[in-house]
């Protein structure tokens, strides 16, 4: 299994744990996944691709009346994952 396979697996687990309850613990796990991705040098585009794949899997099993809630939760989770990328970019730009 590759690093990206591990990342995809961990992302899927955390995302699917976040969807039903939107718990702070699952959201925190999303942040940690983003942090690990930055440390491991995963590109933001690769992370977006993983998010997209996992979201599409979830949407296939989502009843029509819940699509808006799932899309909203997915956005919240993805923003938390991307928070570390934002901090790293700001740190880089501030260091110029």
Model-inferred region functions:
Residues 1-95:
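Non-catalytic regulatory/interaction regions at protein termini and inter-domain linkers
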């Amino acid at each position: 299994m590759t690093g990206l396979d591990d990342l995809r697996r961990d992302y899927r687990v955390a995302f699917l744990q976040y969807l039903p309850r939107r718990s702070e613990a699952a959201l925190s796990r999303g942040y940690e996944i983003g942090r690990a991705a930055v440390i491991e040098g995963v590109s933001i585009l690769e992370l977006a691709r993983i998010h997209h794949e996992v979201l599409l899997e979830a949407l296939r099993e989502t009843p029509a009346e819940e699509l808006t809630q799932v899309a909203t939760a997915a956005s919240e989770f993805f923003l938390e994952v991307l928070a570390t990328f934002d901090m790293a970019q700001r740190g880089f730009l501030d260091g110029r």
